[in-house]
């Protein structure tokens, strides 16, 4: 469905038509990124995402035009949605996965809820190399969504809570780079570092325009800790 420009557009607009929300979020998936980078991506019923083998050499030499062409239906869908009269005076939210969360899926080849290798965190060189490549193509993916008509970008870090060490290197720094990139494009950016714990420090370092918090976090506490623009 994510690669069917007509159906994904219709699914995106359904909540607007029914509930008159003031913004729509595109129907897509954060795993469109590894798919665009050449890694096989599939979904098993009852099990969730399943990715193919990771070929770092192939990823290091990926052609940007090939990436753009593979994800062309996604951008065409966004363009179709943004031009629909129903979205007049409403925002269209595009999104990506944060570099760390994309890396987790690409290396682990499945949701870490199902299985996370004990040695996952041991190959620091692989992690650092892959984060650089992922960040590069996330920036391209973000730019393409904005060019197609997205007026807000959201960054989902679904597995931020997995890290106990190296949070600055693996989460804060690459996410800050994305946030800064979006701001240069003059588009608001929202972050959701699920399970991060220290939202104040995250916001102080990464400096998003908005932040989502976990369902079990007291919003009154967050309001006192974080500077609200």
Regions found by a protein language model. Give the residues of each.
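A short acidic, glycine/proline-enriched capping/turn motif at secondary-structure boundaries
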Residues: 30-33, 48, 57, 99-101
């Amino acid at each position: 469905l994510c690669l069917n420009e007509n159906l994904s557009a219709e699914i995106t607009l359904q909540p607007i038509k029914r509930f008159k929300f003031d913004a729509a979020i595109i129907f897509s998936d954060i795993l469109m990124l590894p798919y665009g980078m050449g890694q096989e991506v599939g979904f098993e019923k009852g099990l969730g995402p399943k990715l193919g083998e990771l070929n770092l050499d192939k990823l290091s030499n990926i052609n940007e035009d090939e990436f753009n062409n593979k994800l062309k239906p996604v951008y065409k869908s966004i363009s179709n949605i943004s031009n629909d009269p129903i979205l007049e005076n409403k925002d269209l939210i595009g999104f990506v996965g944060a570099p760390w969360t994309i890396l987790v899926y690409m290396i682990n080849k499945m949701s870490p809820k199902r299985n996370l290798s004990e040695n996952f965190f041991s190959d620091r060189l692989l992690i650092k190399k892959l984060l650089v490549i992922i960040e590069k193509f996330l920036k391209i993916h973000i730019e393409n969504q904005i060019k197609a008509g997205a007026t807000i970008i959201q960054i989902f870090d679904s597995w931020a809570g997995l890290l106990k060490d190296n949070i600055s290197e693996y989460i804060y720094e690459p996410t800050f780079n994305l946030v800064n990139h979006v701001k240069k494009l003059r588009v608001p950016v929202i972050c959701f570092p699920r399970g991060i714990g220290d939202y104040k420090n995250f916001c102080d370092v990464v400096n998003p325009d908005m932040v989502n918090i976990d369902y079990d976090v007291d919003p009154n506490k967050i309001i006192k800790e974080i500077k609200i623009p």
